[in-house]
UniProtKB/Swiss-Prot annotation:
The lineage of its organism: Bacteria, Pseudomonadati, Campylobacterota, Epsilonproteobacteria, Campylobacterales. Coiled coil: none annotated. Keywords: Cell cycle, Cell division, GTP-binding, Magnesium, Metal-binding, Nucleotide-binding, Septation. This is Probable GTP-binding protein EngB. The gene is engB. Belongs to the TRAFAC class TrmE-Era-EngA-EngB-Septin-like GTPase superfamily. EngB GTPase family. It comes from Helicobacter pylori (strain Shi470). Mg(2+) binds at S38, T59.
């Protein structure tokens, strides 16, 4: 079983010069405003670290968290950073994904060699939105051989059973599902442990 032994806030950055040194592998969490990034991060890490903005789309800083993961079964202990990006696409503050990510954020994603995994959160109730398609295309266009992209569907518990089943069968792979705090709705949907195992596997495939 994987346990998060430590998780704490490092810094908020609005410029590359403000970012912490690239000393360990990192995963980036990205998604539209109100997709549930803060809830996902807090559940994943077992600690209330990520804060939701009172005004969706207002935050423009990247938040860095240091985390230590332990897999006792495999005698493994590893430290990774989690980078929480500002939510994109809120209609009142942005006209396009390109504008959202120009400058600092795009430069951060393009040049930071320590980033090994992009986790794109998608609202399960609103699939195939143009802004999510654009986000996926932009991330995949800059992926290096030592990086991976993974979709994770939030708000899964808001779907009825037929909708859940269709999503599970038809969603493009690879993907994970974040149901209500990762409580398994049935044996075929992932628990928090499965999510952690999957992310750890990606992060360890190409360590820094």
């Amino acid at each position: 079983m994987i346990a998060i032994k430590d998780a704490h806030f490092l810094t908020s950055s609005g410029q590359l010069s403000q970012c912490p040194a690239s000393l360990t592998s990192e995963m980036v969490i990205l998604g539209r405003s109100n997709v549930g990034k803060s809830s996902f991060i807090n559940t994943l890490l077992g600690k209330n670290l990520a804060k939701s903005s009172a005004t969706p789309g207002k935050t423009r800083l990247a938040n860095f968290f240091s985390t230590t993961w332990e897999d006792k079964e495999n005698a493994l202990r590893a430290t990774f950073n989690v980078i929480d990006l500002p939510g994109f696409g809120y209609a009142k503050v942005s006209k396009s994904l390109k504008k959202e990510w120009e400058g600092f954020l795009w430069e951060l994603l393009s040049v930071r060699v320590s980033i090994k995994l992009f986790i794109h959160l998608v609202d399960a109730r609103h699939l195939n939105l143009e802004i999510d398609k654009n986000a996926k295309e932009n991330i995949q266009a800059l992926l290096r051989p030592d990086q991976a992209y993974l979709s994770l569907f939030t708000k899964f518990d808001k779907l009825n059973k037929n909708e859940q089943h269709r999503l599970f069968l038809n969603a493009p792979k690879p993907f994970l599902i974040n149901s209500a705090h990762f409580n398994a709705l049935s044996s075929k949907y992932p628990t928090l442990e499965v999510v952690r195992q999957t992310l750890l596997k990606y992060l360890l495939t190409n360590p820094l």
